[in-house]
């Protein structure tokens, strides 16, 4: 110890107290990497308030924010997937289903509700991407057909929010059959003179994009959503060419005429209510 240390008063070294912040309070935008307050992000419908990047939102949260609060009823909730093929790859299909159900709280990858949209009668469907990549299974097809039948029965418009990797390989031909099944149901809806608005969100690929997602009377994309059949990496490897900038993004598809509109998620409720009111020859109830 030096002579200076002997004459100077001893100071206590204190370490700052650690505050226990619960997990999940903060999150990071996957586009701009800004740290965001989780509650604020949820109020903003999972759209980054800094850069407007549209993050993925759960099927149930989407429908609950889209439809009027009063009078919402779920359709086809009792339908549950079955492992009829006893399929097994690196894991048993039965185990994949159990894990997905535990993670999402849903029985399968499509949630269907009927209700009103600013007073306009509607049936709305939303894919849950966290459930095995939003893949189309027999239950997804059955629920979608139920949605169409309910629309025809009660004269309601139909809206579907797609986000999917395509057909569910663990169900083989049972899954592929849903492409024809859902397309045939939409033909019946069209013959009944009722509108179908398809909203393609990030990502909408494979058998879903090749069937129900692209059959809307009006096809809407969310900003910068990846939309296509095969993914861009697969296409590049096949054609051995560099793809154009923004290829398969909703802005590219709008420019080429593959979709009709791009609508910000925060404006979706008002814009679609206005469109459906015109198509059903009714009026919107202003809030």
Swiss-Prot record:
Q: Which Pfam families match?
A: Carboxyl_trans, Zn_ribbon_ACC
Q: In which pathway does it act?
A: Lipid metabolism; malonyl-CoA biosynthesis; malonyl-CoA from acetyl-CoA: step 1/1
**Annotated ranges, domain CoA carboxyltransferase N-terminal:** 25-287
Q: Does the keyword Lipid metabolism apply?
A: yes
Cofactors, names only: Zn(2+)
Which keywords does this chain's UniProt record carry? ATP-binding, Cytoplasm, Fatty acid biosynthesis, Fatty acid metabolism, Lipid biosynthesis, Lipid metabolism, Metal-binding, Nucleotide-binding, Transferase, Zinc, Zinc-finger
Report C4-type zinc finger ranges.
Answer: 29-51
Tell me the residue numbers annotated for binding Zn(2+). Answer: 29, 32, 48, 51
The Gene Ontology CC terms held by the record are:
acetate CoA-transferase complex
Q: Return the InterPro entries for the record.
A: AcCoA_carboxyl_beta, Acetyl_CoA_COase_Trfase_b_su, ClpP/crotonase-like_dom_sf, COA_CT_N, Znf-ACC
Q: Spell out the SUPFAM superfamilies in the cross-references.
A: ClpP/crotonase
Q: How is the cofactor bound?
A: Binds 1 zinc ion per subunit.
Enzyme kind, highest EC tier: transferase
> What NCBIfam families does this protein map onto?
accD
Task: Summarize the subunit comment.
Answer: Acetyl-CoA carboxylase is a heterohexamer composed of biotin carboxyl carrier protein (AccB), biotin carboxylase (AccC) and two subunits each of ACCase subunit alpha (AccA) and ACCase subunit beta (AccD).
Family statement: Belongs to the AccD/PCCB family.
Note the HAMAP family from the entry: AcetylCoA_CT_beta
Which protein are we looking at? Answer: Acetyl-coenzyme A carboxylase carboxyl transferase subunit beta
């Amino acid at each position: 110890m030096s002579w200076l240390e002997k004459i100077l008063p001893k100071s206590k070294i204190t370490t700052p107290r650690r505050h226990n912040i619960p997990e999940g309070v903060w999150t990071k935008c996957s586009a701009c990497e800004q740290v965001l307050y989780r509650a604020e992000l949820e109020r903003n419908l999972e759209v980054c308030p800094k850069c407007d990047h549209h993050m993925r939102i759960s099927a149930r949260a989407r429908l609950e924010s889209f439809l009027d609060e009063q009078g919402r009823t779920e359709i086809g909730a009792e339908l549950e997937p079955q492992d009829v093929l006893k399929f097994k790859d690196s894991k048993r299909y039965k185990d994949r289903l159990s894990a997905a159900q535990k993670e999402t709280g849903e029985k399968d990858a499509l949630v269907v509700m009927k209700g009103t949209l600013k007073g306009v009668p509607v049936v709305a469907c939303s894919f849950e991407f966290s459930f095995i990549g939003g893949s189309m299974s027999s239950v997804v097809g059955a629920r979608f057909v139920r949605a169409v039948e309910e629309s025809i029965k009660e004269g309601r418009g139909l809206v579907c929010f797609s986000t999917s990797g395509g057909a569910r390989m663990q169900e083989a031909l049972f899954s592929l059959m849903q492409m024809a099944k859902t397309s045939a149901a939409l033909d019946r809806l069209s013959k009944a003179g009722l509108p179908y608005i398809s909203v393609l969100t990030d990502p909408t690929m494979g058998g879903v994009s090749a069937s129900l997602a692209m059959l809307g009377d009006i096809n809407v994309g969310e900003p910068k959503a990846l939309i296509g059949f095969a993914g861009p990496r697969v296409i590049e490897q096949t054609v051995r060419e560099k793809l154009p900038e923004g290829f398969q993004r909703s802005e590219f598809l709008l420019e080429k005429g593959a979709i009709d509109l791009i609508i910000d998620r925060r404006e979706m409720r008002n814009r679609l209510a206005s469109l459906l009111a015109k198509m059903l020859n009714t009026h919107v109830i202003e809030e």
